[in-house]
């Protein structure tokens, strides 16, 4: 039976992604000045205006918010007033206030930590029990062997397309391109990803903002030659593959002038393209004490190491927290029947080799540093520059699994 899988990606100039980039650029500047900053910053961008609001706790950081916002807009490419939104002339409104002391206090001293005696706090196993989760919630991490980066194929291909559009725009190779763009890829298989013997691209959709002086015919020809065929493996394309290039027609008005953008509205683009569940929490603008972000990264780290160890072809890791508590309230592993051990035994292995307390995650992945602006576009996963993409625990997991099999 044929099964269709679709994912989309949006460019760094898409208004929602611009908002994410601004929020993460501000986060990075706070962390650069004060690594223990607590930050939750949201951005709205619209015609001629950016609005930044949120909660911050930083004792020594002095961030020029206006400057950071304008530099972020400049980097993305909104540099002309006739775009309806630009780095120099658009207004920047700021409403940032202090983090709630009630939230800050429960994160600083977790419920478990408050109940310990000084002697208990000094024990090695409690080193990372001081910091509590910044909120309740559930987070998912996923890995699959269908691509070298252990990501679902449709989202991987969609990100390639939008990255390529940005490269061609910034290099001047296609001078009519403008910052706002989207791509969507539909992959068809004759079964589940781990079972399929045939895979090809059924449909590609590209919508790209452009200048007024280019024809639809020129855009279509360039997208096929310089974008699609440059980044999509030829063996995945067939004579039946369908292409829709700017199917709405002209796309001159774009970016925040065409659509208002908000931080956190592209959570499926940011993760696995709809291949697996999502807990609902966005990433951008949040410091790593917010488990919406750090625990989702850690769940990916766990899932990727499971697959890299050869213990499953697909792995979904779900972790959940209560605000103010250090230890997760639940952890679940689902390998979709591809595991070399039962999911329950794999979950036991995960608990033995990974520490999902927020403070432990921050320490292990070195998250209190300015690395977040680069996550804002083209996905947070499947990119080797990020620490949660390491597979440094795969060998230990493999050995532990072998020992369990021998004991059975």
Curated annotation (Swiss-Prot):
Question: Briefly, what is this protein's role?
Answer: Catalyzes the formation of S-adenosylmethionine (AdoMet) from methionine and ATP. The overall synthetic reaction is composed of two sequential steps, AdoMet formation and the subsequent tripolyphosphate hydrolysis which occurs prior to release of AdoMet from the enzyme.
Subunit structure, as described in the record? Homotetramer; dimer of dimers.
Q: What is this protein's gene name?
A: metK
Q: Which residues bind ATP?
A: 14, 180-182, 250-251, 259, 265-266, 282, 286
NCBIfam families in UniProt: metK
E.C. number = 2.5.1.6
Q: Which organism is it from?
A: Deinococcus geothermalis (strain DSM 11300 / CIP 105573 / AG-3a)
SUPFAM superfamilies xrefs: S-adenosylmethionine synthetase
Q: Does the keyword Zinc apply?
A: no
Family the entry assigns: Belongs to the AdoMet synthase family.
Q: What is this protein called?
A: S-adenosylmethionine synthase
Q: Where is this region: Flexible loop?
A: 99-109
What is any one GO biological process for this UniProt entry? S-adenosylmethionine biosynthetic process
Identify the GO cellular component terms for this protein: cytoplasm
Identify the enzyme class.
transferase
Q: Which keywords does UniProt give here? A: ATP-binding, Cytoplasm, Magnesium, Metal-binding, Nucleotide-binding, One-carbon metabolism, Potassium, Transferase
Reaction catalysis annotation: L-methionine + ATP + H2O = S-adenosyl-L-methionine + phosphate + diphosphate
The lineage, from the top, is: Bacteria, Thermotogati, Deinococcota, Deinococci, Deinococcales
């Amino acid at each position: 039976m044929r099964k269709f899988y679709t994912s989309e990606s949006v460019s760094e100039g898409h208004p929602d992604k611009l908002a994410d980039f601004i929020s993460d650029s501000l986060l990075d500047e706070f962390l650069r000045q004060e690594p223990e900053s607590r930050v939750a910053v949201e951005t709205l961008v619209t015609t001629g205006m950016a609005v930044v609001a949120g909660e911050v706790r930083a004792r020594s950081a002095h961030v020029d918010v206006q400057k950071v916002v304008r530099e972020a807009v400049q980097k993305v490419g909104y540099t002309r007033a006739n775009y309806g939104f630009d780095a120099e002339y658009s207004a920047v409104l700021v409403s940032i206030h202090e983090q709630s002391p009630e939230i800050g206090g429960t994160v600083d001293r977790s419920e478990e930590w408050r109940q310990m005696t000084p002697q208990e706090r000094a024990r090695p196993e409690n080193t990372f029990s001081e910091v509590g989760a910044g909120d309740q919630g559930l987070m998912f991490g996923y890995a699959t062997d269908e691509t070298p980066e252990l990501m679902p194929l449709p989202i991987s291909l969609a990100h390639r397309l939008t990255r390529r559009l940005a490269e061609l725009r910034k290099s001047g190779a296609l001078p009519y391109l403008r910052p706002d763009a989207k791509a969507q890829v539909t992959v068809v298989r004759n079964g589940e990803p781990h079972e399929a013997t045939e895979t090809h691209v059924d449909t590609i959709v590209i919508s790209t903002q452009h200048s007024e002086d280019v024809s639809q015919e020129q855009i279509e020809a360039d997208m096929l030659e310089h974008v699609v065929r440059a980044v999509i493996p030829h063996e995945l394309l067939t004579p039946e593959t369908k292409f829709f290039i700017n199917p709405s027609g002209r796309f001159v008005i774009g970016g925040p002038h065409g659509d208002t953008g908000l931080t956190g509205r592209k959570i499926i683009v940011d993760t696995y393209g709809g291949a697996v569940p999502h807990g609902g929490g966005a990433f951008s603008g949040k410091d790593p004490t917010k488990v919406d972000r750090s625990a989702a990264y850690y769940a990916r780290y766990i899932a990727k190491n499971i697959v890299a160890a050869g213990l499953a072809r697909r792995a979904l890791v779900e972790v959940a927290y209560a605000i103010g508590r250090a230890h997760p309230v639940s952890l679940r592993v689902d390998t979709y029947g591809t595991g070399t051990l039962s999911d329950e035994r794999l979950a036991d292995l995960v608990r033995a080799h990974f520490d999902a307390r927020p403070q432990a995650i921050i320490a292990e992945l070195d998250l209190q540093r300015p690395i977040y602006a680069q996550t804002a576009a083209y996905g947070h996963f499947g990119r080797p520059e990020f620490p949660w993409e390491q597979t440094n625990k795969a060998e230990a997991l493999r050995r532990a699994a072998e020992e369990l099999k021998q004991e059975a």
